């Protein structure tokens, strides 16, 4: 368990440091800023790279909503759920702390939104609580469907991190203007702790919605994605002679 715990810590650290770091330092850098597109790709690349790096050790969750969804789907033991979530939150908080120290090392730097997630007046596009709730549930549900589908035994081995990384990129392209994109309670927690105030007050939504979405995605996958007991749906059957 210690190797898995460390892997989840490192993977979530890299996700927050790379994804939120790109938003904090590079998104609006004068003349050369990477914008929403660059931030979206940064988040996708963090998951892709760490899934290959440590996914073979821990499964590469890096996200409490993913761990909950996989548990609901019967793909992850419930006994390991709390240790995984603890490792993920710790990784996110340590990454946020590192970003904070780096940011405040610049003369005249202001923490601002610090890539925290929010709704209402703290949504990048001014979207309501209901909008934030719906988009986080829907996108996390589809994220779990992609994860469960791409890691299924009938899919060629080795391509899952690519599909999952691209899915997370797409998720960010859709929802950065709405909530700054969470779909990951650990990622939201790390940033909120250093912003304080409104970010902590709104943090509940970025635990509730992704976890609910993850569970929904898992149930949807179990209904249509799993092979039937009597046979292998979608598999090639030998020709009769």
From Swiss-Prot:
Signal peptide per UniProt: none
The record places the motif (NPA 1) at 63-65
Where in the chain is the site Selectivity filter?
43, 172, 181, 187
**Single GO molecular-function term?**
water channel activity
Function description: Channel that permits osmotically driven movement of water in both directions. It is involved in the osmoregulation and in the maintenance of cell turgor during volume expansion in rapidly growing cells. It mediates rapid entry or exit of water in response to abrupt changes in osmolarity.
What does the record note on quaternary structure? Answer: Homotetramer.
- The identity of this protein, by name, is Aquaporin Z 1
Species in which this protein is naturally found: Agrobacterium fabrum (strain C58 / ATCC 33970) (Agrobacterium tumefaciens (strain C58))
Query: What is the taxonomic lineage of the source species?
Result: Bacteria, Pseudomonadati, Pseudomonadota, Alphaproteobacteria, Hyphomicrobiales
């Amino acid at each position: 368990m210690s190797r898995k715990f460390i892997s989840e810590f490192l993977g979530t650290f890299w996700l927050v440091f790379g994804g939120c770091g790109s938003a904090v330092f590079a998104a609006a850098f004068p003349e050369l800023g990477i914008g929403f597109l660059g931030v979206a790709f940064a988040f996708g690349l963090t998951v892709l790279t760490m899934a290959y790096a440590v996914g073979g050790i821990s499964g590469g969750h890096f996200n409490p909503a993913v761990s909950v969804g996989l548990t609901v789907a019967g793909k992850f033991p419930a006994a390991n759920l709390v240790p995984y979530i603890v490792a993920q939150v710790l990784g996110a908080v340590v990454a946020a702390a590192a970003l904070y120290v780096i940011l405040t090392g610049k003369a005249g730097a202001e923490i601002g939104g610090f890539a925290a997630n929010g709704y209402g007046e703290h949504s990048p596009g001014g979207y309501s609580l209901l909008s934030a709730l719906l988009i986080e549930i829907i996108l996390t549900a589809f994220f779990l469907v992609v994860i469960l589908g791409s890691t299924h035994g009938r899919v060629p081995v080795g391509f899952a991190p690519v599909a999952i990384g691209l899915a997370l990129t797409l998720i960010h392209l859709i929802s950065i203007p709405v909530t700054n994109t969470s779909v990951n309670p650990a990622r939201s927690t790390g940033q909120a702790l250093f912003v304080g105030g409104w970010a902590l007050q709104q943090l509940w939504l970025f635990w509730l919605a992704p976890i609910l979405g993850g569970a929904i995605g898992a149930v949807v996958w179990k209904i249509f994605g799993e092979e039937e007991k009597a046979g292998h749906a979608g598999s090639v059957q030998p020709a009769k002679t």
